[in-house]
């Protein structure tokens, strides 16, 4: 028995033969004629001619195995040109045609009449319909990356441990020590973004939310293989660079998701955008968040609303935001971070292309999403300034003054590790219970 496609090669299967003798051998368009030595449609003829004349070079993102089909022929120009050459289209015929045309124009003695195809038969036919999605499906590697990240996002947000009354939680610890064991800063209490009562934030809640967000974010960093592969010194620097921007990206998405006109926190409290309501909030919290809130809402949350951003885009943006190369990191650390950042950027690009109607729509959406990153970085710097003032002047915020918030937010702590804090005599070794019952 003859089994269909038993002897069909991989490239033949991915690029099926034309259904008739007059079909284009490149894309299967039924209206083919002989051009440059092979049966091809006007669209592929024009594409081949322009590619050879202008010496264009293309690059395929999918191992040079893209499907070249009539409706999707414009998806990958590299594979389309390769297919043109494979079916026998002669590049020399294109070059000789151009040489002949140039010679005729220079001599001017012999008028060579060349029948031009209608304007809409080459370039217009070569356009990809706007309702055709650039990619039929994502690569399985991208699907695995996204599935893993969404699973870890859910796991970290729902990671809850019983509160240990015998344990003390402190903000007066070294950064590296806190990174290795974030549970010493705060218990992994239940995350409650969407509280029904939604109280205004207080100084006690400010302190708790800072610590719980620290623990939550470090737990999430640990889900990324690139972060786990770093040495301790690189981890410490990367946490200082990205803890605040990643946190603000997370806060913004939750404010957008739960339609809160202000900053929503992990314990269900919030800080309002409305200046009138802000008068009901304690002065320390206004000092901390007052400068940040307007930009937070106008430049980040509103952008998410306009784009109708989804959770997949948010987690990929968080990974890109976190993995920031920097000259202060080791060479190996920068290599690991740069490779990981490119991986998540490619995953985001492919995901957006899959859900968008055409390359223009996908490009616009990707640009709008990436524009969020510098804004959250600025918000992080605003918080650095606010937190330094509060951490130095408010013992209610961090117990003994200075401590972990100072080390995280102080700019000079990025450059020196040994001198980022004073002697132990300046700080009381005081452990204050953090959890607020």
From Swiss-Prot:
Q: Which GO terms describe its cellular component?
A: nucleus
Disulfide-bond pairs as recorded: none
Tell me which InterPro entries the record gives: C.elegans_NHRs, HNF4-like_DBD, NHR-like_dom_sf, Nucl_hrmn_rcpt_lig-bd, Nuclear_hrmn_rcpt, Znf_hrmn_rcpt, Znf_NHR/GATA
Q: Which SUPFAM superfamilies match?
A: Glucocorticoid receptor-like (DNA-binding domain), Nuclear receptor ligand-binding domain
Query: What are the DNA-binding region positions?
Result: 21-96
According to the record, the segments passing through the membrane are none
Q: Where in the cell is it found?
A: Nucleus
Looking up Pfam families in the UniProt record yields: Hormone_recep, zf-C4
Annotated NR C4-type zinc fingers sit at 24-44, 60-79
Q: Which residues form the NR LBD domain?
A: 141-409
- Superkingdom of the source species: Eukaryota
- One GO MF term, please? RNA polymerase II cis-regulatory region sequence-specific DNA binding
Q: What CDD domains does the entry give?
A: NR_DBD_HNF4A
For biological process, the GO terms are: cell differentiation; regulation of transcription by RNA polymerase II
Q: Which PROSITE patterns match?
A: NR_LBD, NUCLEAR_REC_DBD_1, NUCLEAR_REC_DBD_2
Q: What is its main location?
A: nucleus
Q: Which UniProt keywords apply?
A: DNA-binding, Metal-binding, Nucleus, Receptor, Transcription, Transcription regulation, Zinc, Zinc-finger
Primary role: Orphan nuclear receptor.
Family of this protein? Belongs to the nuclear hormone receptor family.
Q: Mind telling me which PANTHER family this protein's record contains?
A: NUCLEAR HORMONE RECEPTOR FAMILY, NUCLEAR HORMONE RECEPTOR FAMILY-RELATED-RELATED
Q: This protein is called what?
A: Nuclear hormone receptor family member nhr-100
Instruction: Tell me the gene name.
Output: nhr-100
């Amino acid at each position: 028995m003859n089994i269909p496609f038993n002897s069909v090669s991989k490239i033949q299967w991915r690029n099926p033969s034309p259904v008739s003798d007059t079909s284009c051998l490149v894309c299967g368009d039924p209206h083919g004629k002989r051009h440059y030595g092979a049966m091809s449609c006007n669209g592929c003829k024009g594409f081949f001619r322009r590619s050879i004349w202008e010496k264009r070079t293309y690059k395929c993102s999918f191992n040079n195995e893209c499907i070249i089909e009539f409706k999707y022929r414009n998806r990958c120009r590299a594979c389309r040109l390769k297919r043109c050459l494979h079916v026998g289209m002669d590049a020399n015929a294109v070059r000789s045609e151009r040489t002949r045309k140039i010679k005729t124009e220079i001599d001017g003695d012999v008028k060579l009449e060349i029948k031009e195809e209608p304007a809409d038969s080459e370039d217009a036919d070569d356009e990809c319909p706007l309702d055709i999605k650039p990619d039929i499906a994502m690569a399985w590697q991208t699907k695995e990356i996204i599935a893993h990240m969404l699973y870890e996002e859910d796991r970290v947000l729902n990671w809850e441990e019983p509160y240990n009354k015998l344990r003390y939680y402190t903000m007066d610890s070294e950064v590296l020590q806190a990174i290795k064991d974030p549970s010493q800063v705060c218990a992994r209490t239940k995350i409650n973004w969407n509280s029904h009562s939604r109280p205004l934030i207080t100084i006690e809640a400010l302190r708790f939310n800072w610590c719980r967000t620290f623990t939550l974010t470090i737990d999430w960093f640990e889900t990324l293989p690139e972060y786990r592969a770093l040495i301790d010194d690189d981890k410490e620097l990367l946490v200082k660079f990205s803890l605040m921007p990643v946190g603000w990206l997370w806060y913004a998405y939750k404010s957008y998701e739960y339609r809160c006109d202000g900053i929503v926190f992990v314990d269900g409290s919030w800080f309002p955008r409305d200046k009138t309501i802000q008068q009901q909030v304690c002065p320390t919290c206004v000092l901390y968040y007052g400068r940040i809130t307007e930009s937070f809402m106008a430049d980040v949350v509103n952008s998410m609303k306009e784009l109708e951003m989804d959770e997949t885009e948010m987690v990929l943006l968080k990974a890109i935001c976190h993995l920031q190369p920097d000259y202060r990191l080791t060479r190996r650390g920068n290599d690991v971070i740069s490779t990981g950042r490119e991986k998540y950027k490619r995953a985001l690009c492919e995901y957006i292309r899959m859900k968008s109607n055409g390359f223009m729509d996908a490009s616009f959406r990707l640009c709008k999403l990436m524009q969020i990153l510098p804004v959250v970085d600025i918000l992080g710097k605003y918080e650095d300034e606010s937190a330094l003032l509060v951490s130095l002047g408010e013992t209610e915020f961090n117990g003994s003054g200075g401590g972990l918030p100072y080390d995280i937010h102080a700019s000079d702590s990025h450059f020196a590790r040994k001198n980022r804090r004073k002697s132990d005599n300046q700080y009381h070794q005081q452990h204050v219970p953090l959890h607020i019952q």
